[in-house]
Amino acid sequence: MSSISLSVLDDSVLIKPINEEKQGGIVLPSSAEKKPTKGEVIAIGEGSRNSSGERIALTVKAGDKVFYRQWAGTEIEHGSEKLIVMKESDILAIIK
């Protein structure tokens, strides 16, 4: 797991995409490549608030490997790392 010095808010999740290795030696331009849909959770927010003001804990935790929607979230760069900030609801599954 990475040691990133970022905090995300509410029900947001910070993901480091995992790029799958390409087989066969075919090089595609970046515009033709499929966006990754698998990543590692780096950080999570404290959760959104319910109508009583209490925090609703997130299901995922830092270190989880997950599948997420292909066009989910906002891509950011922090140092040399490309990361994605998304809502927990954009995560489809936790890989066990």
Curated annotation (Swiss-Prot):
An example molecular function term from Gene Ontology annotations: ATP binding
UniProt-listed GO biological process terms: chaperone cofactor-dependent protein refolding
Domain of life: Bacteria
Name of a matching Pfam family: Cpn10
InterPro entries named in the record: Chaperonin_GroES (IPR020818), Chaperonin_GroES_sf (IPR037124), GroES-like_sf (IPR011032)
A GO term from the CC aspect: cytoplasm
Entry annotated with the keyword Chaperone: yes
Keywords carried by this UniProt record: Chaperone, Cytoplasm
Subcellular location: Cytoplasm
Subunit structure: Heptamer of 7 subunits arranged in a ring. Interacts with the chaperonin GroEL.
Family stated for the protein in its record: Belongs to the GroES chaperonin family.
The protein's role, per its UniProt record: Together with the chaperonin GroEL, plays an essential role in assisting protein folding. The GroEL-GroES system forms a nano-cage that allows encapsulation of the non-native substrate proteins and provides a physical environment optimized to promote and accelerate protein folding. GroES binds to the apical surface of the GroEL ring, thereby capping the opening of the GroEL channel.
Name of this protein: Co-chaperonin GroES
Provenance organism: Wolbachia sp. subsp. Brugia malayi (strain TRS)
Gene assigned in the entry: groES
